[in-house]
């Protein structure tokens, strides 16, 4: 843990943190950066220690992307299933990092693999969280053609989370990729319709629509910034908030 100041009351009681697979790469071009995984785990541990119930959805883009494979000629459904298995690998790596910090963690997969992790069972996941355990949801929704962002929106709604936090490699939502266009406009707050009408690259339309229908706010922040997760939980730091109305 990094000693983040968590003396102020958290704004949220139960949250879902979506971590992209790419965020786990750190400065690498492929796979997992162990130091980055441990840093993110440390931030999660600080938030859990403050009494916040946390669940996660982790992407698999650092290992395999079904959409990219489909563009290269692979059957899309087959590619998506491979991508789902990649998320299980990432989930197990994050579980190991959290348990190294003595944070009790369970992995639940939408694709049953009993010898590796628990199957996804909604009520069991809720009980885990009530007992202070972190739950990592793996294998997306278990269905091809759905992104892990949509899986995050679905699980957040099922778990009754107060907010969906998307940890990315930049500190919010921009009109264009700020790493390619330093002058890109940054937004502090947007509505769901803003994101959809402007075709902003935050989440896919299905994920945004699911959050909108369930009145689930979305917060986008830089997960590579040490302690950022804890600051967002307290309503501090730099982030973009996506809500029904501004």
UniProtKB/Swiss-Prot annotation:
Any GO BP annotation: 'de novo' CTP biosynthetic process
Coiled-coil residue spans: none
Ligand binding (ATP): 18-21, 61, 65, 168-169, 174, 177
Localization of this protein: Cytoplasm
Activity control summary: Inhibited by UTP.
Keyword annotations from UniProtKB, A to Z: ATP-binding, Cytoplasm, Kinase, Nucleotide-binding, Pyrimidine biosynthesis, Transferase
Presence of the UniProt keyword Nucleotide-binding in the record: yes
Binding site for UMP: 60, 80, 141-148
SUPFAM superfamilies: Carbamate kinase-like
Location, primary (coarse class): cytoplasm
Family to which this protein belongs: Belongs to the UMP kinase family.
Function: Catalyzes the reversible phosphorylation of UMP to UDP.
Subunit architecture: Homohexamer.
Stated name of the protein: Uridylate kinase
Taxonomic source organism: Granulibacter bethesdensis (strain ATCC BAA-1260 / CGDNIH1)
